[in-house]
A protein has these predicted regions:
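C-terminal catalytic "cap/lid" subdomain
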Residues: 114, 118, 166-167, 178, ...
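N-terminal donor/sugar-recognition subdomains of glycan-related enzymes
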Residues: 29-109, 119-122, 256-286
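Acidic/Gly/His-enriched mid-domain segments of enzyme catalytic cores or analogous surface patches
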Residues: 90, 103-106, 129-130, 136-241
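N-terminal amphipathic/basic-hydrophobic helices that include classical n-h-c signal peptides
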Residues: 1-35
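Glycine-rich anion-binding loop/nest that anchors nucleotide
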Residues: 110-116, 135, 221-229, 244-259
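Glycine-rich beta-alpha loop segments
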Residues: 122-127, 134
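Buried, small/hydrophobic-residue-enriched core segments of structured protein domains
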Residues: 215, 248-250, 267
Length: 286
């Protein structure tokens, strides 16, 4: 059998989008084999991550059709735009670029959660680490002293967002930070708004589109995850970053973080228990 692809091979190849329908049932999740064929597809590192998404829908009474409809609408909206960086080949190239940045040079990756504090970020900046922000947590970077803030923004590899992160998310988008934009059943207005902000900037953010259905959607990815924080960890693992190289900052299950955006506190606390299960599935400490 062929050996698994190296990070160099994965980063230099672009995903092809063959003439398939919009929705196709997932093949068995043999990550190495799939990545040899489509190196920039971001697949779950563990089948359990897709099972959890199904259980979450059942727990909260959400419909799979709503998740699929939002995903389809997002894909159509992005691909109907006239922004060159949002075409399907350029989105695949954005994945390849992020793989090069996060994997080819062995480095730590710090995922910023909704409860992240400035001192945690400052300590991480003392090391050669990259940052990945879960939605509005990117806002913590602008609370740092000016010179340090700009250095921190330069370390931000991407944000992972479903569009409801408020000012922190908007600022990252206005800076042209790459965005993993997520579709689910009740965030149509949020992702539409974020796309409008991005489209109006001089240099629109590169996009990678994600969904949470158990089907393959060409042009989109489902690396697993539920909340923005644990989905960010799923994204980083799916790109090939070892679990030992990932540090979770501001990831807590006992409080609703200040960067969570507008949310119902009771429901959010329930969601955080699912985040805990996902991170345990990934074997990532926090």
């Amino acid at each position: 059998p062929r050996p698994p692809p190296t990070a160099v091979q994965a980063a230099s190849a672009l995903a092809s989008s063959g003439p398939r329908g919009l929705f196709n049932t997932h093949r068995p999740l043999l990550l190495e084999r799939d990545q040899m064929d489509r190196p920039t597809d971001l697949l779950p590192v563990d089948d359990e991550l897709l099972t959890i998404q199904t259980e979450v829908r059942e727990q909260f009474g959400w419909e799979l059709d709503a998740d699929a409809s939002s995903a389809r609408s997002m894909l159509e909206a992005v691909e109907a735009s006239e922004i060159d960086d949002w075409t399907r080949p350029r989105r695949a190239a954005s994945v390849a670029s992020l793989i090069r940045r996060t994997v080819l040079r062995p480095t730590e990756v710090a995922v910023l959660g909704a409860a992240v504090e400035a001192d945690e970020v400052l300590r991480m900046l003392e090391r050669p680490a990259l940052l990945v922000a879960s939605d509005g947590s990117a806002g913590i970077l602008s609370t740092l002293p000016d010179s340090t803030a700009e250095r921190a923004w330069s370390r931000l590899a991407c944000i992972v967002s479903d569009g409801d992160g408020g000012q922190g998310t908007a600022e990252a988008v206005k800076r042209g930070t790459p965005v993993f934009l997520h579709a689910h059943g009740d965030n149509l207005a949020e992702w539409e708004s974020l796309l409008e902000i991005a489209a109006e900037t001089p240099t629109p953010s590169p996009l990678v589109l994600t969904h949470q259905t158990p089907t393959t959607i060409p042009g989109m990815h489902n690396p697993g995850g539920f909340t923005d924080g644990d989905r960010a960890a799923c994204v980083v693992r799916s790109m090939g970053v070892p679990k030992e190289a990932i540090t979770m900052l501001g990831t807590r299950t006992d409080v609703v973080g200040r960067w969570s955006g507008v949310t119902d506190a009771e429901t959010k606390m329930e969601k955080l228990q699912w985040m805990d299960r996902i991170l345990r599935t990934l074997e990532i400490d926090y």
